[in-house]
C-alpha cells in the first residue's frame, strides 16, 4: 500500500512524537456540508450512499478536500450489522433509523445469524478498499463499528430511544437473553472490524453511544465486558504498522479508569470530562481523543479558538492527544466554523510539541 504522507494521527494514538496535535471530527462527512447534501440527493437516500462504494468514497473524501484534517473516517452507519442480521434497517425522514423487525425473546435472539463480514457486509469492505486507494496515502483511514450494547438497544427498541425501557427491561428481566444478544453482536463486531482492517482501515473506533445510559454495575457487565472481548480479538498489526483501537463511551466519564483497562490504545472523551483530569486519571496507559462540545461550532470563530486553546492547555504538553469533538458535528453548523476549529487546533497546538 502507498506510504502515508501524514501519519500524525496514528503517531498520536500510539503516543509517538508529533509536530502539532492531529484533528478530525466525528461525522465530518455529513449534512453540514453542501457537497454531502448534493451527493445524498444523487444517491437517492442514506442507505444508498452507504451501500454504494463509489458514493461512500466520494462523501468520505469531501471534508478532506475542504479542510486540512489528519484522518478520514469510513462513511457508513453503525447499524449495518443489525441490518445484515435481517432486522430490515430503513430511515424515516426526520425520524432517524428504524427496524422492520425487533428482538424481544430468547427465541428471537437464538434465531439471529452472525453475519459474514465478506459476504453479508462486502459493500463496506469494498468501500474501505476504494477509499484507501483514492486517499493514496494523504491521511490514515479509520474504520468503525457500534458497541454491542448500543447495537442491542436499536434492535430491541426498533430504533432510537430516549429511555431504553425495552432494552433495560430485558437486561434486568432476562439477562440470559441480553447476554446472548450481546455475545452474538460482539462476535459480529470483531469479524466486521477485522474485515475493515484487512481491507485497509489503519485504525478502528468502537462507538458506545448509549453506554452512558446504564448504571455503573450494568455498564461493566453489559457494555464494557463485551468491548473488552472485541478489543482482545482485533487484528492489531497489518501492512507493517500497528492498528490502534479507539473506544468511545458517550457519558462514560465516571468509568475512565475501567475503560482504559480493556486493552484499547485510545480512550474517546465526550465534552463533559475535563481532558487534563482525564489524563491524570488514566496516566500513561492510553492516549486520549476529544473533546470539544460540538455546539461550540455555533459560536463565532474567535470563541471557537478560545475553547480550542482552553482544551489544549488543559491537556498540556506532549503527544497522546487527538483533538476531536465530544460527539458528532451537527447538521446546522456553518462549514466555515468547522474550518476555523481545525485551523485553530493546528495553529495553537505547536507550542505543546516543542
Curated annotation (Swiss-Prot):
Pfam families (alphabetical): URO-D
Protein name: Uroporphyrinogen decarboxylase
Quaternary structure, from the entry: Homodimer.
Keywords annotated in UniProt: Cytoplasm, Decarboxylase, Lyase, Porphyrin biosynthesis
Cysteine-cysteine disulfides: none
Native organism: Pseudomonas syringae pv. syringae (strain B728a)
InterPro entries attached to this UniProt entry: UROD/MetE-like_sf, Uroporphyrinogen_deCO2ase_HemE, Uroporphyrinogen_deCOase
Top-level EC class as recorded in UniProt: lyase
Residue numbers binding substrate: 27-31, 77, 154, 209, 327
Domain of life: Bacteria
GO cellular component terms, A-Z: cytosol
GO MF annotations, alphabetized: uroporphyrinogen decarboxylase activity
Entry EC no(s): 4.1.1.37
Lineage of source species: Bacteria, Pseudomonadati, Pseudomonadota, Gammaproteobacteria, Pseudomonadales
Positions marked as site (Transition state stabilizer): 77
Cell location: Cytoplasm
Amino acid at each position: 500500500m502507498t506510504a502515508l504522507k501524514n501519519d500524525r494521527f496514528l503517531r498520536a494514538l500510539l503516543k509517538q512524537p508529533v509536530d502539532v496535535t492531529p484533528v478530525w471530527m466525528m461525522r465530518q462527512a455529513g449534512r453540514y456540508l453542501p457537497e454531502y447534501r448534493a451527493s445524498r440527493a444523487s444517491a437517492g437516500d442514506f442507505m444508498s450512499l452507504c451501500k454504494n462504494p463509489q458514493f461512500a468514497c466520494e462523501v468520505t473524501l469531501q471534508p478532506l478536500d475542504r479542510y486540512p484534517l489528519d484522518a478520514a473516517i469510513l462513511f457508513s452507519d453503525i447499524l449495518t450489522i443489525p441490518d445484515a442480521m435481517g432486522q430490515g434497517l430503513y430511515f424515516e425522514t426526520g425520524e432517524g433509523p428504524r427496524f422492520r423487525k425487533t428482538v424481544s425473546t430468547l427465541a428471537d435472539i437464538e434465531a439471529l445469524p452472525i453475519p459474514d463480514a465478506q459476504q453479508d457486509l462486502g459493500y463496506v469492505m469494498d468501500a474501505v478498499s476504494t477509499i484507501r486507494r483514492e486517499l493514496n496515502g494523504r491521511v490514515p483511514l479509520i474504520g468503525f463499528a457500534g458497541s454491542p450494547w448500543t447495537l442491542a438497544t436499536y434492535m430491541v427498541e426498533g430504533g432510537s430511544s430516549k429511555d431504553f425501557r425495552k432494552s433495560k427491561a430485558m437486561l434486568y428481566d432476562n439477562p440470559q437473553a441480553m447476554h446472548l444478544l450481546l455475545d452474538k453482536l460482539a462476535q459480529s463486531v470483531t469479524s466486521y472490524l477485522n474485515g475493515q482492517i484487512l481491507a485497509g482501515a489503519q485504525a478502528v473506533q468502537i462507538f458506545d453511544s448509549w453506554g452512558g445510559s446504564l448504571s455503573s454495575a450494568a455498564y461493566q457487565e453489559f457494555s464494557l465486558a463485551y468491548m473488552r472481548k472485541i478489543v482482545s480479538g482485533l487484528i492489531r498489526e497489518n501492512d507493517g504498522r500497528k492498528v490502534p483501537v479507539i473506544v468511545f463511551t458517550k457519558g462514560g466519564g465516571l468509568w475512565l479508569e475501567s475503560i482504559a483497562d480493556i486493552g484499547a490504545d485510545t480512550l474517546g472523551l465526550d465534552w463533559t470530562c475535563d481532558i487534563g483530569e482525564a489524563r491524570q486519571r488514566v496516566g500513561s496507559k492510553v492516549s486520549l481523543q476529544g473533546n470539544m462540545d460540538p455546539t461550540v461550532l455555533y459560536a463565532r470563530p474567535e470563541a471557537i479558538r478560545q475553547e480550542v486553546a482552553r482544551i489544549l492547555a488543559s491537556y498540556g504538553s506532549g503527544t497522546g492527544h487527538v483533538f476531536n469533538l465530544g460527539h458528532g458535528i451537527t447538521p446546522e453548523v456553518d462549514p466555515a466554523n468547522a474550518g476555523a476549529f481545525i485551523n485553530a487546533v493546528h495553529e495553537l497546538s505547536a507550542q505543546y510539541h516543542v
